[in-house]
Amino acid sequence: MLAPSSNCSLASQRLTPEGFAQLQSALQDFVATLPQAFYWDSRSLHTHLRTQTGDCAIAIAAGFQLLLLGRTAAEYCQPHPLSEPHHVSVQFGADSIQRYCQATNLPVEYQPALAQLGDLSLNPDLISQFSNLLIAAIAADRAPLAAQYPAVSVCQPLEQALHWQEEQDRLISQVSAQIRLSLDLSEILTTTIREIRQLLNADRAIIYQFKPQCLDAGLDQRWPLYIPSQSYITYEDRRNEALLSVIDPLVQPGLLITTEEWQRFQQGETLLIDSVGFYKERLPEQYSFYERVQVRSVCKIPILVQGRIWGLLVAHQCQQDHRWQPRERDILQHLAEHLSIAIYQAQLYGQLQDQTQTLENRVLERTQELIDALALAQAANAAKGEFLATMSHELRTPLTCVIGMSSTLLRWAFGPLTERQREYIKAIHDSGEHLLELINDILDLSQIEAGKAALQVRPFSLSRLATQTLNTLQEKARLGEIQLMLDLQLNNRVDVFRADPKRLRQILINLLSNAVKFTEPQGTVFLRVWREGDRAIFQVSDTGIGIPESEQAQLFQKFQQLDTSIRRQYGGTGLGLALTKQLVELHGGHIQIESTVGQGSTFTVWIPEQTLIEPVEPRPSIDNLPAGHILLLEEEDEAATVVCEMLTAAGFKVIWLVDGSTALDQLDLLQPIVILMAWPPPDQSCLLLLQHLREHQADPHPPLVLFLGEPPVDPLLTAQASAILSKPLDPQLLLTTLQGLCPPNLSEGDRPSS
């Protein structure tokens, strides 16, 4: 598109009044085919008004604004006949229309049409189409004009030159517009070669695009240079199908270029051959090719991109020898320059696309790698969590037995123990305690990292927590000849704190145990506790070996310890401080260390006060508990034990059955007030029980409460259940649900005992 400010005009032509009127009609029909069209001409004015405005026409449409001027007001007043031919001029652009209307006070409302367009740019294709209309009007008007006014023919060469210039400008504008609008080089070259052939009235137009590697490899050979057809790409346009196509490698197996031609091409010079007989003696192979494809005259123009030969623009005349004109050479050179710009843009765009694609591929590869790594890590983490969940009970139970039994043996046996026996049993006991401590740390750390740890927030006394924790380590400190000191900077007003006391106790035990472990005999360990606003600060200081500054950063990393000699002397796994940091951050707090080698270390922990969860409703009163039994169907011992203990502690009477067949047989005998069933069911017999309850809905039967580990397949089951609870069970929700489903207590004797 041409910018709206670039007003275009065509050279002035001469038309008779009849020819001008025909041109007005043709323009009106042309504009009517365009979107947002507006047309007005002076034929609608009275004759005396036309003597003031002159003959004109205004056409406005999307991409097209034109002012057509015929006889001026002054020419209307001249004495020569009105039938004489007059100059006709054409101006493009909204500015030309506005200036003319303001100068002549033309009575036409054109402004709304311009305002409706918004975009006042010009479309070169529409300008070209109107130029064809103008040429046709001049040609139709010229035949009678030549007979009446012979002098008009004197202007014919000038008109031809103007027409040629107009076509040249149109073609260059079209190529330029296509370059701006498209980055498809093949499309640009195909369109350009067709327009060039038509403009030159040539029989064949060709663009040869050399492949870079062919030139680099071929320039070292002997001259004339031979470029095989597989080393270039050919774009061709022919006048008709009767002419042979040079795209066919059987017709043109390659290009021959002489030394002189190549040197001229490198300088950007055009080669004009009016007769191919020029090659008969100089390059017989080339002459033979031209005879085969019927070429009489040839024009060759190099296309240079960044100073390097990219290809050739070639035109063939096949009917007769043709004397190439300078104007033909000039337009081909101009087009070659514009093509050079288009090619360079396409190359840059191609490089950018390649780089973009490469980067996108890298991003996709890295993203996929990250996705795979994440999936692998998630799978590993899930496997670890599943393993730890499965093994936690299996690990802790035998260790508890080992510790418990060895402790019992140390205190009681069927006879006196020898010193060695006592040492052996004590070694078993101590090793078991150490192993249990290690396993607990690993399981706790894994639970926190998996996001499964939750705080049990409640109010507690900071001073009592600190005192009890310190007392726990008194024996260990006494054996190491280390003095434990407690500094409580608290009063009764700030002593009560809301957090998870069990987790805080674990934090303090880890820090104090470390302090005792790394403090030499006769040393001192201090525990200081104070409040700062809504935060509690715990500080553990020791007079131990200290920690080098270079190693302090890795203290809170899992399985990280000090150097090997210290690890051999003091032991440890490197989990305690990592777990401590996780527990502190679980509270939303932070931990800090200050240490000097040979003087000791100080760990300071800041814990913000936690928000207390809503108080749990009181346990149902025994006086309000219903009479009767609750029937529990659960195959897992641990899950059943938890539910039984929970309900028994609340005052309910529970009957636990593993299979549904027993429950079905004894349903009338047991007469439960509620049936609790785990889903998926333990066995198929439970499904028979459900079917029985469904088929006897008309009869009174106890409410059904389901514990869901996964959603039920049968939608009728959901409708049949009186309540559905998710695993793991919420104790308060279970008790509240049962209280709502159970019938009221009718007799004192049937109440469950406490």
UniProtKB/Swiss-Prot annotation:
Modified residues (Phosphohistidine): 393
Region (GAF domain, required to complement the deletion strain): 184-338
Catalysis: reaction(s): ATP + protein L-histidine = ADP + protein N-phospho-L-histidine
GO biological process, one term: circadian regulation of translation
Entry EC number(s): 2.7.13.3
Keywords associated with the record: ATP-binding, Biological rhythms, Cell cycle, Cell division, Cytoplasm, Kinase, Membrane, Nucleotide-binding, Phosphoprotein, Transferase, Two-component regulatory system
Consequence of gene disruption: Shortens the photoperiod by 2 hours as well as its amplitude, and offsets it by about 6 hours. Uncouples kaiA and kaiBC expression, cells no longer reset the clock in response to a dark pulse. Cells are very long. Half of KaiC is always phosphorylated, phosphorylation phase is disrupted. In double labA-cikA deletions KaiC levels are much higher than either deletion alone, but the phosphorylation ratios are nearly wild-type. RpaA is highly phosphorylated.
Gene Ontology molecular function terms on file: ATP binding; histidine phosphotransfer kinase activity; phosphorelay sensor kinase activity
Region (PsR domain, required to complement the deletion strain and for cell pole localization, attenuates autophosphorylation activity. Binds KaiB(fs)): 606-754
Domain Histidine kinase: 390-611
Residue numbers spanned by region N-terminal domain, not required to complement the deletion strain: 1-183
Induction: In light/dark cycles, increases in the dark phase and decreases in the light (at protein level). Rapidly degraded in the presence of the quinone analogs DBMIB (2,5-dibromo-3-methyl-6-isopropyl-p-benzoquinone) and DCBQ (2,5-dichloro-1,4-benzoquinone), artifical electron acceptors for photosystem II that reduce the plastoquinone pool. Oxidized but not reduced DBMIB leads to protein degradation (at protein level). Low constant protein levels in the absence of ldpA.
SMART domains membership: GAF, HATPase_c, HisKA, REC
Listed PROSITE patterns: HIS_KIN, PHYTOCHROME_2, RESPONSE_REGULATORY
Principal EC category: transferase
InterPro entries (alphabetical): CheY-like_superfamily, GAF, GAF-like_dom_sf, HATPase_C_sf, His_kinase_dom, HisK_dim/P_dom, HisK_dim/P_sf, Phyto_chromo_attachment
Keyword Cell cycle found: yes
Location(s), subcellular: Cytoplasm; Membrane
Highest taxon of the lineage: Bacteria
Family according to the record: In the N-terminal section; belongs to the phytochrome family.
Assembly and binders: Homodimer. Part of the circadian clock (KaiA, KaiB, KaiC, CikA, RpaA, SasA), the composition of which varies during the circadian cycle. Interacts with LdpA. KaiA and CikA compete for binding to KaiB(fs).
Domain observations: The N-terminal domain is followed by a GAF (phytochrome-like) domain that lacks the conserved Cys residue for ligand binding, a histidine kinase domain and a C-terminal response regulator domain without the conserved Asp residue that is phosphorylated (pseudo-receiver domain, PsR). Autophosphorylation is dramatically reduced in the absence of the N-terminus (residues 1-183), and lacking in the absence of the GAF domain; removal of PsR increases autophosphorylation 10-fold. Thus PsR may suppress the histidine kinase domain.
Name of the protein in question: Circadian input-output histidine kinase CikA
Organism: Synechococcus elongatus (strain ATCC 33912 / PCC 7942 / FACHB-805)
Gene from which this protein is expressed: cikA
